[in-house]
Amino acid sequence: MTFNITSMDEDVLLTERESSFRVLTGCFLSVLILSTLLGNTLVCAAVIRFRHLRSKVTNFFVISLAVSDLLVAVLVMPWKAVAEIAGFWPFGTFCNIWVAFDIMCSTASILNLCVISVDRYWAISSPFRYERKMTPKVAFIMIGVAWTLSVLISFIPVQLNWHKAKTTSFFDLNITLHDRTMDNCDSSLNRTYAISSSLISFYIPVAIMIVTYTRIYRIAAKQIRRISALERAAVHAKNCQNSTSNRNSLDCQQPESSLKTSFKRETKVLKTLSVIMGVFVCCWLPFFILNCIVPFCDPSLTTSGTEPFCISSTTFDVFVWFGWANSSLNPIIYAFNADFRKAFSNLLGCYRLCPTSNNIIETVSINNNGAVVYSCQQEPKGSIPNECNLVYLIPHAIICPEDEVLKKEDESGLSKSLEKMSPAFSGILDYDADVSLEKINPITQNGQPKT
């Protein structure tokens, strides 16, 4: 009798612990879903509301990414969250459609990240050709290819049952071994589909992203050194001119501050690109490794413990949520540059409460003789540019002299901000809270802006 009472107490305690764990899981997943919805909805609303954001072709890719992540938060995450809390799949035959949505939306998100990396590499490596060739039509074709691939590897195989393994799945056996008689929507993939879909959805895109961002860093670092050399030469010439007039040869020396600035800029670029790739890889790599390994598990050997790669369905689900969490981080990484931050502040009605610092805008003009003329001005807080035909500066243009930038920042009390190099960096290289926007304006032969 005492044994029965003790057993009942243990069962009640386990039930309470399981209920508490499910409540905590539900709260965490709800926060994740809401943050994904809010971030990506803000991105879409900002582009719809402000015309200057729609005028930049590179933002088309950001919008496509936001839409795919928004679909993850609407069509994929809530249904799985309910199943996690309930402990079983309560939606019956909707499982196959949900699996197709899961594969399609996740693949679309990853392929859009890949397209963004290609777009920004093209803008950095061939800026003049990019300005001519990257039209809205080309952008829509690239986006269309990404979404078409996502649909082809999701709905067609799933609806035709090409994706399922013919043998008893490891996860199904795992549920049976634990005496759990519940509806289950953990679809077991066959080996061919698991490997081929993983290649298209992750491994090929991540390889492309690694190559493009590595080359972007090399080009950016090289250009930063060129600009630093021009700055040092200009300051050196100015010092020598002043020392000649003052007859003081000690003032005519190479400045060291520009070298430090160049190193800091390169480090900042490297950190930013590392964050982009690091977040993406950390979120998705564990899942896709398991996605390729699990189909090779032999269910008949799981009881003997001789299968080292077979894992529980709970562990697999944790890494699935890690991948989906990437959709909540993408708006922060790709759409939190100065333009989008100001748009978000205006949409939320907090442009007076949310401090947005003044931006030093470097306007670079090229006259008919090929000479580069530049000027600097500050943009007031909370303002949204009215121009719709902004053309971002290529990385070969000359920026404002360092001492002039520092002088303006001393007057406004702002910290030092680094310059964006091209449209490829418009969404990712937001160096500090204050960023500089660059554009090319055609000017007349005498050096005056064309009206």
Curated annotation (Swiss-Prot):
Q: Which residues are glycosylated?
A: 4
Q: Which domain of life is it from?
A: Eukaryota
- The species this protein belongs to is Xenopus laevis (African clawed frog)
- On whether Transmembrane helix is a keyword of this UniProt record, the answer is yes
Which Pfam families does this entry report, sorted A to Z?
7tm_1
Tissue localization of expression: Brain.
What protein is this chain from? D(1A) dopamine receptor
Query: Keyword annotations for this protein?
Result: Cell membrane, Cell projection, Disulfide bond, G-protein coupled receptor, Glycoprotein, Lipoprotein, Membrane, Palmitate, Receptor, Transducer, Transmembrane, Transmembrane helix
Q: Name one GO cellular component term.
A: ciliary membrane
Bilayer-crossing residues are 23-48, 60-86, 96-118, 138-162, 192-217, 272-298, 316-340
Its family remark reads: Belongs to the G-protein coupled receptor 1 family.
Which PANTHER family does its entry note? Answer: ADRENERGIC RECEPTOR-RELATED G-PROTEIN COUPLED RECEPTOR, D(1A) DOPAMINE RECEPTOR
Query: Which cysteines share a disulfide bond?
Result: 95-185
Q: Which InterPro entries match?
A: Dopamine_D1_rcpt (IPR001413), Dopamine_rcpt (IPR000929), GPCR_Rhodpsn (IPR000276), GPCR_Rhodpsn_7TM (IPR017452)
Q: Which GO terms describe its molecular function?
A: dopamine neurotransmitter receptor activity, coupled via Gs; G protein-coupled receptor activity
